[in-house]
């Protein structure tokens, strides 16, 4: 099973020009510690709740946050077990999926990966 087949549509990315508060609200709503950030279709990086709390100004645009070192993603043809390994290695709650031009395709939550691993992918 490839990453592109595991994408969930219920967790939308936030846009680079949106307020940081919106990202934090979505993380809370979806019970995640990370959320993908995009600029149109281009993947920018993975915003963590820790980055938000360190920044400490929720009304600012997400574009004010430095994403260097937080650009974790897998390619769309990455195998399921490699996606699980990636999630574990970087201690993520969600894994962004991109094509080879870094266009954002969607994301896979840790819960979804665990459900599949346990055979409960319904």
For the regions a language model picked out, list residue spans one by one.
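Bateman (tandem CBS) regulatory domains
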Residues: 1-11, 59-71
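Histidine- and aromatic-rich ligand-binding microenvironments
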Residues: 6, 19, 36, 51-52, ...
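ATP/adenylate-binding site constellation spanning eukaryotic-like Ser/Thr protein kinases
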Residues: 8, 40, 49, 58, ...
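The conserved cystathionine-beta-synthase
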Residues: 13-31, 38, 73-92, 97-100, ...
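Generic amphipathic, hydrophobic interface segment in small proteins and small subunits
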Residues: 29-54
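Short hydrophobic beta-strand motif reused across regulatory alpha/beta modules
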Residues: 44-50, 93, 105-113
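Structured N-terminal alpha/beta-domain signature
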Residues: 49, 63-70, 83, 96-97
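A short, polar/charged loop-to-alpha-helix boundary motif
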Residues: 51-66, 113-122
């Amino acid at each position: 099973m490839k990453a592109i087949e595991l994408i969930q549509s219920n967790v939308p990315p936030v846009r680079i020009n949106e307020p940081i508060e919106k990202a934090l609200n979505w993380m809370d709503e979806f019970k995640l510690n990370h959320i993908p950030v995009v600029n149109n279709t281009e993947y920018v990086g993975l915003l963590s709740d820790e980055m938000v709390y360190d920044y400490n100004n929720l009304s600012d645009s997400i574009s004010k946050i430095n994403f260097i070192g937080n650009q974790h993603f897998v390619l769309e043809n990455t195998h399921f077990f490699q996606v699980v390994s990636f999630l574990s290695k970087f201690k993520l709650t969600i894994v962004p999926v991109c094509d080879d031009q870094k266009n954002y395709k969607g994301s896979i939550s840790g819960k979804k990966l665990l459900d599949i691993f346990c055979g409960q992918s319904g």
